[in-house]
Amino acid sequence: IPGFVIQGGDGEHGKKSALNAGRVGTGGPGYKFADEPVKGDYLAGALAMANSGPNTNGSQFFICTDDLTGKLPRNYTLFGQVTKGMDVVAKIVSAPRNSRDLPDKPVAMTSINVLPDEA
């Protein structure tokens, strides 16, 4: 969603060879876990756990496309930051999409690099 986030991580429907666009984003891993303390801000490139309410974390995540500090409730656990590749995030968010804000053509992350924490 331009000016907001890109979201992914559908554990049920995102891995099927024939994607059903009406179901993508509705799946989950079959488990939920508790919220964790939020440390940091929802800056552009922030990687956070998506959920549907308190203690409903699962497999879905989002990446902020803009600085959303103060615009999102602080119940989405932050667990990363895009350090390279915001140009890819911009391409995903600008892709043609349907009325449910799903891309017309499926988008998949095929690799990521996890860097050591600099703290």
Predicted regions and their residues:
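Cyclophilin-like peptidyl-prolyl cis-trans isomerases
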Residues: I1-A119
